[in-house]
Amino acid sequence: CQEKKPEKTVEETGCEIAVIAEGSGEADISVTEATWKSVKAFADEHELAAGKYEPEEASEEAYLKSIQQAVDDGAGFIVLPGRSFETTAYKAQTSYEDTDFLLIYGVPHDEKNNYATGANTVSVVFAEEEAGYLAGYAAVKDGYTKLGFVGGKEIPEIKRFGYGFVQGAASAAEETGAKVELAYKYAGTFEESDEVKELAAGLYKDGTEVIFACGGLIGNSVVKAAEEAGGKVIGADVDQSGLSDTVITSAEKGIDSAVTTVLKSYVNETFVGGTAFN
């Protein structure tokens, strides 16, 4: 099956594995891309049909409509990549009991924050603070002493990245005796914009050598600022070295490993729902 938009009429395709895209430009967009890449690679290897469904808008109603389309196309396994799918997953796991779900980056809950992971659902959450710690530690060990952190919005996972980055840099500074300076900023958005680029450019102008950019598409803006200023960037979520030579490393979450592990359990008929793991 090919990529589909729910507003179009789609014939039955026998799509076995579906990914519902979070296409609003929010923090989860890089997670969506990484998830789809992993799903497509797994499906191709196992000769299974996989499809990515792009909702009309970023809303629970649109997400559920895309899930219905995937089920109608024959999907037995649906991946929901991003925290914005938490309430959607909560409803879908009950409405489609014969379909297995993988929720990346969240745990199903209702509007009142009552959490429940159904018997047909597995949730995967990540320890961003650990990836952030390693990024900060490595940066100082590599000789960088003027660091910057630019997060998207102040949501828990972005904060965990930032806190880990600070702690990792502090640990390396203690070991090496280096005097480390760290500028800590939030962009207030997950979008690529001139404002984010200007924020990063200001940090580079003030002497920041490398910026850890966390949050959706803001990394693109930070990279542009780095290219103009001769600065460096640390990516987040997935390997972002392909964006630019300014990206020296990335704080990866291991999305590919998580997706592959759960998909293997699905095809081997050993899938056990009702669980959440890191």
Where is each model-derived feature located?
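A residue-level marker of the well-folded mature domains of exported/periplasmic proteins
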Residues: 4-278
